C-alpha cells in the first residue's frame, strides 16, 4: 500500500507477481539475517560499520568506498581478472537483472505508473509515488521509446550474458567437472526463460498482432515467479551478499595501514593485528581452542613460516620418540 495511494495505482492482474516478490523478499531477508549471525560474517559486518564511521578518516573512507563501488560493482573488475568473456557475461547478466528489477518491481507495486493528461491524452505523465516527475508524447518521443523498452533492453543483456556463460559451462572440461546443476545451471536457465518469454511478449504484441499473447504471458508469469522463489535459496542470493564486500575493502585497507602482528617465535610481522585478534575470536566462537602452553600463548601468534617449521620439528620429535620406544 505504501507509495501506491492505498492500492489505487495497483494493477490486480499482477497479484501473482506481488506474492512472488513478497515471498522472495521475506525469505531473502530471513536468510540474510541468518547469514549475518555466522561468526566470520558478523565480524566483517561489525568492523565494516566501525571503519566506515571513523571520524578522523571520513574523507579517506568515502574515497575508498567510491573506488570500491566503481571498480567492484559498476565495472566489476574482480571478474575481468578471470577473463574477458567471463567479464562481459557477468556484466551483461548483472546489469540486465538489476535494470529489470529496478523497472519491474516499482511497476508491480504501483510505485511508478503512467497517466494521460486530462487536456492532452497523447501526453503521458510519469508518476513516482504519486508525484509527477515528467511527461512525454506517446507518438514521437525518445523518452517513450526508452521507457517502454527498458525491460526489452534488460532481457537482451541477460540473454547475451547467459549465452556466454552457458557456452563456457558446457564446453570447458574444468568447469563441467565441478559445476552442479541446481546451483550453477538452474539460475542460468531461469534467467534465460524469463528474458526469452519477456521478449516474446513484445514480439507477439508488435509483430503478431497479439497472437498467443495470453499463453505467453502465463508462461512468462510462471518463469518469473519460479525465479523469485529460487532467489533466496540459490546462487542468485549473492546479489544481496555482494555489497558486504565494501566493508571487506575497508577492513583490508585498515589492516594494511596498521602495524602488523608480530610472530612470537621469530619476531617478524606477518599479518594485520586486528585481523589476528578477530580470527582468534571467531575460532573461539566456533569451538576451536588453539591456545598453547609455553612461551607462545596462541597458535595465531605464529607466522605461517614458523608454523611450517614447527610442524617439521614436531614430526621429527614424534618420529624420534617412536624410534626410541621401538628400540627399548
Question: What label would you give each PLM region?
Answer:
Residues 109-110, 116-117, 252-255, 284-287, ...:
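Short, surface-exposed linear patches
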Residues 263-267, 303-306:
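Short cysteine-rich clusters marking metal-coordination/redox-active sites
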Residues 1-264, 310:
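Membrane-embedded alpha-helical bundles of multi-pass integral membrane proteins
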Residues 176, 253, 276-279, 316-319:
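A generic "cationic amphipathic patch" detector
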Residues 269-297:
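Short recognition patches in nucleic-acid-associated and regulatory proteins
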Residues 247, 278-289, 319-328:
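Short cysteine/histidine-rich metal-coordination sites, predominantly Zn2+-binding motifs
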Residues 291-309:
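Cysteine-rich micro-motifs
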Residues 269-275, 308-315:
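Short functional micro-motifs and their immediate structural scaffolds
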Amino acid at each position: 500500500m505504501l507509495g501506491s495511494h492505498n492500492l489505487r495505482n495497483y494493477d490486480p492482474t499482477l497479484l501473482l507477481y506481488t506474492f512472488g516478490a513478497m515471498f522472495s523478499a521475506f525469505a531473502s531477508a530471513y536468510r540474510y539475517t541468518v547469514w549475518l549471525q555466522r561468526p566470520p560474517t558478523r565480524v566483517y559486518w561489525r568492523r565494516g560499520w566501525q571503519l566506515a564511521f571513523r571520524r578522523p578518516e571520513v574523507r579517506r573512507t568515502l574515497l575508498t568506498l567510491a573506488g570500491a563501488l566503481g571498480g567492484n560493482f559498476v565495472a566489476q573488475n574482480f571478474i575481468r581478472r578471470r577473463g574477458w568473456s567471463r567479464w562481459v557475461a557477468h556484466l551483461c547478466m548483472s546489469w540486465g537483472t538489476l535494470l529489470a528489477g529496478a523497472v519491474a518491481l516499482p511497476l508491480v507495486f504501483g510505485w511508478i505508473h503512467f497517466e494521460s493528461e486530462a487536456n492532452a491524452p497523447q501526453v503521458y505523465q510519469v508518476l513516482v509515488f504519486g508525484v509527477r516527475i515528467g511527461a512525454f508524447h506517446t507518438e514521437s518521443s525518445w523518452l517513450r521509446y526508452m521507457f517502454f523498452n527498458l525491460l526489452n533492453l534488460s532481457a537482451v543483456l541477460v540473454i547475451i550474458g547467459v549465452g556466454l556463460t552457458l557456452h563456457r559451462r558446457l564446453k570447458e572440461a574444468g568447469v563441467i567437472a565441478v559445476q552442479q546443476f541446481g546451483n550453477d545451471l538452474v539460475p542460468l536457465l531461469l534467467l534465460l526463460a524469463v528474458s526469452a518469454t519477456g521478449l516474446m511478449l513484445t514480439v507477439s504484441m508488435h509483430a503478431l498482432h497479439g497472437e498467443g499473447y495470453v499463453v505467453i504471458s502465463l508462461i512468462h508469469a510462471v518463469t518469473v515467479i519460479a525465479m523469485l522463489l529460487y532467489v533466496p535459496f540459490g546462487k542468485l542470493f549473492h546479489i544481496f551478499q555482494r555489497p558486504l564486500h565494501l566493508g571487506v575493502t575497508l577492513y583490508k585497507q585498515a589492516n594494511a595501514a596498521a602495524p602488523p602482528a608480530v610472530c612470537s617465535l621469530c619476531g617478524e610481522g606477518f599479518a594485520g593485528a586486528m585481523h589476528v585478534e578477530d580470527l582468534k575470536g571467531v575460532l573461539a566462537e566456533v569451538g576451536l581452542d588453539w591456545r598453547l602452553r609455553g612461551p607462545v600463548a596462541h597458535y595465531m601468534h605464529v607466522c605461517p613460516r614458523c608454523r611450517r617449521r614447527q610442524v617439521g620439528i614436531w614430526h621429527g620429535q614424534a618420529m624420534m620418540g617412536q624410534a626410541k620406544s621401538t628400540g627399548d
